[in-house]
Structure formats: C-alpha cells, structure tokens
Amino acid sequence: MGSSEGQETHVLMVTLPFQGHINPMLKLAKHLSLSSKNLHINLATIESARDLLSTVEKPRYPVDLVFFSDGLPKEDPKAPETLLKSLNKVGAMNLSKIIEEKRYSCIISSPFTPWVPAVAASHNISCAILWIQACGAYSVYYRYYMKTNSFPDLEDLNQTVELPALPLLEVRDLPSFMLPSGGAHFYNLMAEFADCLRYVKWVLVNSFYELESEIIESMADLKPVIPIGPLVSPFLLGDGEEETLDGKNLDFCKSDDCCMEWLDKQARSSVVYISFGSMLETLENQVETIAKALKNRGLPFLWVIRPKEKAQNVAVLQEMVKEGQGVVLEWSPQEKILSHEAISCFVTHCGWNSTMETVVAGVPVVAYPSWTDQPIDARLLVDVFGIGVRMRNDSVDGELKVEEVERCIEAVTEGPAAVDIRRRAAELKRVARLALAPGGSSTRNLDLFISDITIA
C-alpha cells in the first residue's frame, strides 16, 4: 500500500520501551519527517511504558505515541523472558487493533519484536526492520541461524570463527544472545528474528556504508542491509538545530548538564570519559581498578554511574572526586560530552548507540565489552575501524588489573599508536558526516526507502 504525491502516508514504528531501542527509532522518524512532509509517524510500544514515557523530558519529535497491552498485570516486573513470552502470545492481536485504526503504508519494527513482520504481512502492509546493532552483528546472526556458514562448538570460547568480511573471531567475540551461556530465551529470540526476515522487505541499519562497506557487500546476495545512519543528534553531525526538531535524546534518567561547565575548564584532550551504558550495573571491583589507574596517572575524568549503584561508594573514587580530579554523574548528555574538545578518550561497553556516537564525534575508545553485541562491536572498533584498543580481564583470575587500564588509556592518548588512532577517528568523523549530508550514501538510501513506501 502507498500514497500518491500530496497525500499523507502513515508509518507505524514498533519497539520495546528501552532507551537504546526507542532513540534510534526517534532519530529515524526525524530523518523521514525532514525528507518528506507527507509522512505521519506513530510509535507503538507496550502500555506499561505509558507512565514512564509521560514523565521523561520529551524532545520535539515528529511522532505520536500509541500503546498496546503486553498481556501482563500492571504490577508485573516485566522480566525479559516473561515479557517476550507474553508478547509472542498476545502482541499480534493487540497490535492489530492499532493497525486497523489507520491505513498504514509501512510498519518499521525493532528486531526484538520479531512477531511484528508477520502481523504486517497479515494486514498486507510492507514491513521494514530497523537493525540497531552493527552490520557485522547482523551478518553473524544471519549466517548462524540461517546456516549459510559453518560455526564451531559454541561451548568452547577459544574456538575460532571465520566469516566473510570480518576479522578472525573467537567464539567469545560472538554476540552473547547466540551462546549457550546467554540463556535459551535470548537464543530463541534471535532465532525468531532470523525467521521473521521472510516477511521483511527492507533491513534498515543504523550504520553507514563507508564504515562497514565490506560487511554490507558480503550480505548483498543473502538478505541485504540498507545503511541509513548514523542515527545521532543533528549537532553531532555538524548541523544547526532545527527549530521544530531539536536534537536531544529521549532520556529515562535525567542527565546532568552541569558537567559541561566543568569540562569547559579542562585542558583540550585531557579528560577520560567513562560510561558502561544503561542496562548493566557497574561492578565495585571494576570501578576501584579503573579509579586507581586514573589516580596513578593523575588523569581528569567524567564517569557515569547510575543512581543507587554501590559502585558510587568506592572509597578511592569518592576521594578523587573530593579532591577535584573528576566528576561522577548519575546520567550524562553523552553526545554533548563526546563532542567536547576536552575529551581525550571514551572507556566504553561498546553498545552500538554509543559506538555510533563516538565514531561521529571522532573520539578514540578503550573497549571493555560485556554482553549482547558488545564483544563483536569491540572487535570492529579495534580491528576494523581502527579507533581504539581492547581492555581485557586477566587470563588467570578473570579480574581487571590496574596495569591493564593504564596500558589501554596510554595507548589511545600518548602511546606510539595514538597518532594513528586519532587520525583514523578524525577521518571516520568526516566520512560519517558526509553519509547523511545531501547526496551522501545514507541520504540516498533514505530517499529510496521513502520513495518505495509512498509510491501508490
């Protein structure tokens, strides 16, 4: 279904109510709206998120929020396994009620709601997936679940994995959702994602061709991907703020902008920025180790540790903050921080949204991944993009060591490789901006996608 010129085209986006899932959808909605004034976009998520989304500070995005029931009682804690099982049972029926209210030309689904494409097909509506991880991660998942390539025993983390257009991997580098240690519900979720691709017409990816060109080309004869990123705020791309479409993220935790005043007082390329994302709790022993390394080096730091985490109480960290060496935030305006000239490097968990932001900002990374797609993102950052180093736990006791933290920070700021890393980071920053400039690779892909969904 489509719409002729001048008529309004309705698009429905569907995602789970996680910050790292909603923000890429909102950024895509912004690009679509700027490219075509005739698009009307609804963003659907589960009813239990209504209160949460009503309390956060909302950017001005060109979407209307709609909600559907997840089938669970309001007081249910919504553990991932329980939520996914319930949505598999009732999601299709409840989302259909929303679909029947309008004549939608296209549905854009998160990969983590894999039941949605079949719903779209049942209503004779074309469906796209917005893949919110790396093209490299998509390639691994596709080749594994669709059995197009051979994989070793995934119980043995030391086994090597050889795949087209990727560096030689070990099993430990693969996304944790496909590993036995990741749990059956996550493994099955990705199997359902691979299966749902038969109902999907477009796989849109939050990346850009110049960043993952070989990986993108390697998928061309399988299930092609369409890079339409980087999906970041306009100011990070060097654009002026739009009067009606400002560039703020949707933050479930209130960020502390006071840190920007502190950054303004720091020397150029002097501050280590540390953030391990919104999903996992920071471990006290890791915080103590990293803090000791910063203290030994006398490096100023800006560190995000979520509210009520015990890691905020680590004595050496509190001492350093009291002495003025650094600042600890409960949540941060990350894109603003990464674009500040005082930042020297980013110690990151390597989530894909953070990876895109640091690539566009041109900031070198110390990669310290934990789970999901983070391990393969770390390999890409270090071995493909060439803008950082990998920080590893000790091979004997599995603990992070002070010496390892110091080695990694020195490597991206002062060591012999630092010049090449900074040069490469600056080059990717330039190319990322070009991708979404007029005539850029991602802009052309977005224009073609809009043309597809608006043709009568």
UniProtKB/Swiss-Prot annotation:
CDD domains: GT1_Gtf-like. It comes from the Eukaryota. InterPro entries: UDP_glucos_trans, UDP_glycos_trans_CS. One of its GO terms (biological process) is regulation of auxin metabolic process. UDP-alpha-D-glucose binds at residues 278, 332-334, 349-357, 371-374. Gene3D superfamilies: Glycogen Phosphorylase B. This is UDP-glycosyltransferase 84B1. It comes from Arabidopsis thaliana.
